[in-house]
């Protein structure tokens, strides 16, 4: 089977050296076979299962966002994505027990985002996503991390 490669550049910046940032070195090392994580990550491309609710022209692989969220936030943290698109960041945030607010101007992509959100509300689909990410060593096995209380999956924020 032939491999195809794509590259995503991620800029990790902050406004000032006075502002602290969070990086979970221990978890990243654990996910990387007990070796310090490098700044070049090789992750699976977008799978068909990630496009079950439609295609977005610049959709990112769920694994990329899951790794970024784990590396840079703690469980329960808020994640803001001002360019929501197909809500991959929101899906990753939700799967990893973070709160999420996404902004999107295009109705087509809002509908896709809502469908993806509804999809992971199904516990079978949610568990499948978590198992796929764990198998790819992007996250720890699902029983090893915090999962948000599903009684209010919207965190009190209305879903439009």
What are these regions, as identified by a protein language model?
Residues 108-160:
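PRPP-dependent phosphoribosyltransferase catalytic core
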